[in-house]
């Protein structure tokens, strides 16, 4: 009887303790919820959240709509978009608090639905989850793939392809030509040669597929990110299948490229030692062969890196070059000034090399101003909180998406005089740079998730732009005035011109 009593006593005690622990846990969770204090934002409706407030705003260019809402609700704003809890930062002060003070806590990057469709989601440079593999791929990117030394070592590719670009434009002298296509072809080929060399017989096909991939990804609905139950929409529309078919076809080409590189190392054509002319596949295979990596690199990892390079390096550089040329055509005095600098510094040269353009300070100011006024990624890439964070007196819970409206910051009249005007002089003798420490100017992001290919991207702009402005004078199509040039943007993975840029090149005659 005593044993039975002890049994029930112990059992009752365990039940009571379990109940007590649950009560305490429930109180703790409730207490945590009470502590949450989200930033202000528009009112919410059941199911759709704040989506109805975007109706009537410019949803084709969402950074416009978000800027309008931020003007009403403040520089740190909360939106509930279906299931997605989103905080939008729209000031340099909020950028600094998030990207500097809370950088570690928001080092996670949410993987969008369109990336999850692809097999390499979570292994590429852009969307790899925060953790050991992210640390490894970031170190490889900074120290091997996109270091200043590595980018400089690829000068021969940019010099070769930019010379071909000049010759191509000479063939259109005096006629209206599609400069958008010419610049896109240049950038795509430079990225391809940097990624896997110049001996790929299917290079042009892969470039075409990569451009189709970016366009197809931009066309996939974002609704499944806000309403996961609507994931069937891209399936029924055929867009998911189309995206997968492009990836499958391109992957076959990458399989051949990687295998050829492996065979090259086995046949001693490449000795496995670091070389100035290593392409990205060479570098990754060398690192894998060295045995020094904590996490082995697979073929899928190499493919994911190549896709990242194409997605991040091709459109961003060509878009920046084309927006720069567009602004120069709209501002003839700036065009005259930058051409005068280039032609004075490079006077008498029949060919231009990267070593020749290091002192073109005004041209670099022109590029910076184009990046400010026509930022390629106006909303940057989103982050996600890994734990509750406090920002400006508000408490933002774990797993909240963080969006950075860089477009609003670079147009902020409190930070920039005449922010809507193209004035490169604002960057002359000004330490303001795009490398992530000036939060009013972050075209490549900041902190742990800053774009690792920044140096590579800028290098792919500077040399071709210098050659375009040195070797040619440029005119708008007949009958068009500078203020009539269409500057409409198209939102996507990169925010470029909606319509191609057509100009008339005339060879500059004062070159011996």
UniProtKB/Swiss-Prot annotation:
Pathway(s) it belongs to: Secondary metabolite biosynthesis; terpenoid biosynthesis
Q: Where are the transmembrane segments?
A: 7-27
Predominant place of localization: membrane
Q: Which UniProt keywords apply?
A: Heme, Iron, Membrane, Metal-binding, Monooxygenase, Oxidoreductase, Transmembrane, Transmembrane helix
Question: According to Swiss-Prot or TrEMBL, what is its membrane topology?
Answer: Single-pass membrane protein
Recorded hits in SUPFAM superfamilies, A to Z, give: Cytochrome P450
Q: Record-annotated residues binding heme?
A: 451
Q: Which cofactor does it need?
A: heme
Q: Which Pfam families match?
A: p450 (PF00067)
Name the Enzyme Commission number(s) assigned to this protein: 1.14.14.-
InterPro entries, per the entry: Cyt_P450, Cyt_P450_CS, Cyt_P450_E_grp-I, Cyt_P450_sf
GO-annotated molecular function? heme binding; iron ion binding; monooxygenase activity; oxidoreductase activity, acting on paired donors, with incorporation or reduction of molecular oxygen
Note whether Transit peptide occurs among the keywords.
no
What is the name of the protein in this document? Dihydroniloticin synthase CYP71CD1
UniProt organism field = Citrus sinensis (Sweet orange)
Origin organism lineage:
Eukaryota, Viridiplantae, Streptophyta, Embryophyta, Tracheophyta
Q: Which gene encodes it?
A: CYP71CD1
């Amino acid at each position: 009887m005593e044993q039975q009593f002890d049994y029930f006593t112990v059992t009752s005690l365990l039940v009571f303790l379990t109940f007590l622990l649950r009560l305490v846990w429930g109180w703790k969770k409730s207490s945590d919820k009470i502590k949450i204090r989200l930033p202000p934002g528009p009112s919410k409706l059941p199911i759709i959240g704040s989506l109805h407030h975007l109706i009537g705003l410019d949803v084709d260019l969402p950074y416009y709509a978000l800027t309008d809402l931020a003007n009403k609700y403040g520089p740190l704003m909360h939106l509930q978009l279906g299931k997605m809890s989103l905080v939008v930062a729209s000031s340099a002060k909020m950028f600094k608090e998030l990207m500097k003070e809370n950088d570690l806590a928001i080092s996670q990057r949410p993987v969008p639905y369109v990336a999850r469709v692809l097999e390499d989601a979570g292994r590429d440079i852009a969307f790899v989850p925060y953790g050991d593999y992210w640390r490894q791929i970031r170190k490889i990117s900074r120290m091997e793939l996109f270091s200043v030394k590595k980018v400089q070592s690829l000068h021969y590719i940019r010099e070769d392809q930019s010379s071909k670009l000049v010759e191509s434009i000479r063939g259109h002298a005096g006629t209206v030509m599609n400069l958008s296509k010419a610049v896109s072809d240049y950038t795509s080929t430079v990225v391809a040669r940097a990624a896997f060399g110049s001996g790929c017989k299917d290079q042009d096909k892969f470039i075409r597929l990569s451009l189709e991939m970016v366009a197809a990804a931009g066309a996939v609905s974002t609704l499944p990110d806000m309403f996961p139950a609507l994931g069937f929409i891209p399936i029924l529309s055929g867009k998911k299948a189309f995206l997968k078919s492009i990836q499958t076809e391109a992957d076959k080409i990458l399989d051949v490229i990687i295998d050829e590189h492996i065979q090259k190392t086995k046949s001693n054509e490449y000795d496995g030692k670091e070389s100035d002319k290593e392409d990205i596949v060479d570098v990754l295979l060398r690192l894998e062969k060295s045995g020094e990596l904590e996490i082995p690199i697979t073929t899928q990892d190499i493919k994911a890196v190549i896709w990242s390079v194409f997605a991040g390096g091709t459109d961003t550089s060509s878009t920046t070059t084309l927006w720069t040329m567009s602004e120069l055509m709209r501002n003839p005095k700036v065009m005259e000034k930058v051409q005068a600098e280039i032609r004075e510094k490079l006077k008498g040269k029949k060919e231009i090399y990267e070593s020749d353009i290091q002192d073109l300070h005004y041209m670099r100011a022109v590029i910076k101003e184009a990046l400010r006024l026509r930022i390629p990624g106006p909303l940057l890439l989103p982050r996600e909180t890994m734990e509750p964070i406090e920002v400006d007196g508000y408490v933002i819970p774990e797993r909240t998406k963080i969006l950075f409206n860089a477009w609003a910051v670079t147009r902020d009249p409190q930070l920039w005089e005449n922010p809507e005007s193209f004035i490169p002089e604002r960057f002359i003798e000004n330490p303001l740079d795009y490398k992530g420490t000036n939060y009013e100017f972050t075209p490549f992001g900041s902190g742990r998730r800053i774009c690792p290919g920044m140096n590579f991207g800028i290098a792919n702009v500077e040399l071709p732009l210098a050659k375009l402005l040195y070797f040619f004078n440029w005119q708008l199509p007949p009958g068009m005035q500078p203020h009539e040039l269409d500057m409409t943007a198209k939102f996507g993975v990169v925010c470029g011109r909606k319509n191609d840029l057509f100009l008339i090149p005339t060879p500059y005659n004062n070159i011996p």
